[in-house]
Amino acid sequence: MSHGPLRVGIGGPVGAGKTTLTEKLCAALAHRCSMAVITNDIYTREDAEALMRAQVLPAERIRGVETGGCPHTAIREDASINLAAVADLRRTFPDLDLILIESGGDNLAATFSPELADLTIYVIDTAAGQDIPRKRGPGLARSDLLVVNKTDLAPHVGVDLARLEADTQAARGQRPYVMARMRAGVGVEAIVAFLEREGGLQLLPQD
């Protein structure tokens, strides 16, 4: 019996690289499983349109949800608008293996209730500063996977990357994290492996 697609919530501050991560995952996985994407923006469908322009998925597999809410959550706390989008995608594509749900904001607890997402990925930006891991916000501490993005910017913004990783490790404890450069595709394989390992995602072999 099918339990339906794996639903993965992607959150993080504006500009951290959530849409780039979503795009890279689509490029890596679209030919290996049946997948779809839901993006959440405040008043526009900008992220959905960016994914369509990138042509990583057919347009009918991308849903742009306009939440009209606070930019720090951008997925309503009751999740109903996103649950409706999930249900619509499952009706349209009954064979779905994976749905990525990209938040427009960084409040992970409000963003992804357990009824909406099976796993959560939180993205932070190295350029946001050395002390981000030490602040230990809920997204950073509690997400199922933390992606520390734009590590190549560290020397340009005065961030000691070794210390940043040590602080990240301390903040995460036993929870996994990935040091990444999403634009270059660095870290994508580790995230795919996480989805297979923790989410039970079954993929066709690489071409």
UniProtKB/Swiss-Prot annotation:
It is found in: Cytoplasm. SUPFAM superfamilies: P-loop containing nucleoside triphosphate hydrolases. Gene3D superfamilies: P-loop containing nucleotide triphosphate hydrolases (3.40.50.300). Keywords: Chaperone, Cytoplasm, GTP-binding, Nickel insertion, Nucleotide-binding. The keyword Cytoplasm applies. GO terms for biological process: urea catabolic process. This is Urease accessory protein UreG.
